[in-house]
């Protein structure tokens, strides 16, 4: 009796059934903070900070906005993720292993180079609280510990870090400044001294690097003198 009920009915192989169940379900990468950060930086790189919206970010990730809000609650959270990701790329490896001047030099050059590629984020990140930004806080802890060990007065350590960052962020803009930024145009005859200095400075192949090195060495030297 059992055989007669199943007669003429083909039982599909397990693999066929699995294939059918999967039809119409394309593979989707797992949404996590790493993907969110990468997508946010891509949008900011194309459209600037103002072009980053939660709706646009969800669209870039090909997810519903509700899925995005399972990981971040607002645009500010996304910016903190972006900040922390960029800061994690800054080289602090020499702090605690080399003289503070050498470590600060490598740190500053690395810091500038990272943010020269993301200048649209500087106005936001420069004033963004570091709450819940572990990589950023770890960087500050590393630099603070090294400065304290070098003899920096504790009440001046944070001010010293801010002095570095103020210079670094401004210099990051200089890396991408247009070549004709100092051209005087129709008023050229009224600035003969500046014009001569500008012409002389053109011998420098990488003027942004020359300016950064000049300012960085002056800052390090001034801080070193204050420790004497």
Model-derived segments and their meaning:
Residues 1-31, 192-205:
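N-terminal intrinsically disordered/low-complexity leader segments
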Residues 35, 77, 106, 138, ...:
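Amphipathic alpha-helical interaction segments
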Residues 83-89:
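Short, basic, alpha-helical segments at the C-terminal edge of helix-turn-helix-like DNA-binding modules
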Residues 92-138, 164:
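Hydrophobic alpha-helical connector segments
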Residues 137-188, 201, 223-227:
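Hydrophobic alpha-helical bundle segments that form small-molecule/ligand-binding pockets
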Residues 35, 39-77, 81:
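Helix-turn-helix
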Residues 209-228:
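C-terminal all-alpha effector/ligand-binding and dimerization domain
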């Amino acid at each position: 009796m059992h055989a007669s009920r199943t007669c003429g009915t083909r039982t599909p192989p397990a693999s066929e059934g699995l294939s059918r169940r999967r039809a119409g379900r394309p593979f989707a990468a797992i949404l996590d903070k790493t993907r969110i950060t990468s997508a946010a930086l891509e949008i900011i790189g194309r459209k600037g900070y103002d072009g980053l919206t939660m709706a646009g970010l969800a669209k870039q990730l090909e997810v519903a906005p509700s899925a995005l809000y399972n990981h971040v609650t607002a645009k500010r959270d996304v910016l903190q993720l972006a900040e922390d990701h960029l800061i994690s790329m800054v080289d602090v490896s020499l702090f605690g292993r080399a003289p503070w001047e050498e470590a600060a030099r490598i740190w500053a050059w690395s810091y500038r180079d990272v943010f020269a590629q993301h200048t649209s984020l500087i106005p936001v990140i420069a004033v963004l609280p570091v709450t819940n930004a572990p990589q950023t806080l770890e960087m500050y802890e590393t630099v603070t510990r090294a400065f304290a060990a070098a003899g920096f007065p504790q009440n001046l350590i944070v001010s010293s870090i801010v002095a570095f960052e103020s210079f670094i962020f401004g210099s990051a803009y200089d890396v991408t400044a247009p070549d004709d930024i100092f051209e005087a145009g129709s008023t050229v005859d009224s600035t003969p001294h500046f014009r001569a200095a500008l012409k002389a400075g053109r011998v420098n192949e990488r003027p942004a690097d020359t300016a950064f090195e000049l300012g960085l060495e002056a800052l390090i030297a001034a801080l070193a003198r204050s420790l004497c």
